[in-house]
């Protein structure tokens, strides 16, 4: 989690949900610890005096983005199960083959930082404000109004690689598999829990 300067605003950064754009909008640099939720200071941020917010993303788009990001970071594969599997099993050419690799071991995929289901952050971070990545250009104004002195404007640009040497189009079967893996995310995404 990341406190927005000296305010009572705390950003719960779900990987691959425009988190770098959010912290940058408030003049902050992204830190690797922004994704953490188990440090003492993170537990302190769960207090009622803090206003916690997060950005939720369409689960299919997030999955493909996480795969692309994993491909771009293969040189940093040690200790990262998804990147190690990509290298060890030749899964760098097709997102569908990558997904099929985890058919019998979904937990191995879902414990990887960039593939952890969004519901984990939603349930454990207890946000009071949920923004949607697909509407972030307008939704961010909710947070900007709470800390106008720090808001520098949102620059929505994808930091993940747009061009990768792999097929990143999911088949219908793969889309169904993603929907099964992230069924709770889809319930939150499509249900009233996140608003419209």
Language-model features and meaning:
Residues 1-196:
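Membrane-interface amphipathic segments in extracytoplasmic regions
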């Amino acid at each position: 989690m990341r406190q927005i300067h000296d305010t009572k605003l705390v950003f719960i950064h779900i990987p691959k949900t425009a988190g770098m754009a959010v912290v940058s909008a408030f003049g902050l640099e992204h830190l690797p610890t922004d994704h953490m939720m188990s440090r003492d200071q993170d537990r302190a941020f769960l207090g009622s005096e803090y206003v916690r917010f997060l950005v939720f993303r369409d689960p299919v788009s997030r999955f493909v983005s996480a795969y692309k990001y994993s491909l771009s970071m293969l040189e940093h594969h040690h200790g990262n199960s998804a990147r190690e599997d990509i290298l060890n099993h030749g899964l760098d050419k097709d997102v569908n083959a990558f997904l099929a690799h985890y058919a019998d071991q979904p937990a191995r995929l879902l414990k990887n930082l960039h593939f952890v289901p969004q519901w984990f952050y939603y349930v454990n971070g207890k946000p009071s404000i949920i923004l949607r990545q697909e509407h972030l250009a307008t939704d961010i104004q909710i947070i900007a109004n709470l800390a106008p002195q720090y808001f520098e404007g949102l620059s929505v640009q994808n930091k993940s690689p747009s061009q990768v040497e792999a097929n990143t189009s999911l088949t219908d079967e793969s889309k169904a598999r993603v929907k099964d893996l992230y069924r709770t995310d889809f319930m939150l995404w499509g249900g009233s829990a996140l608003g419209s």
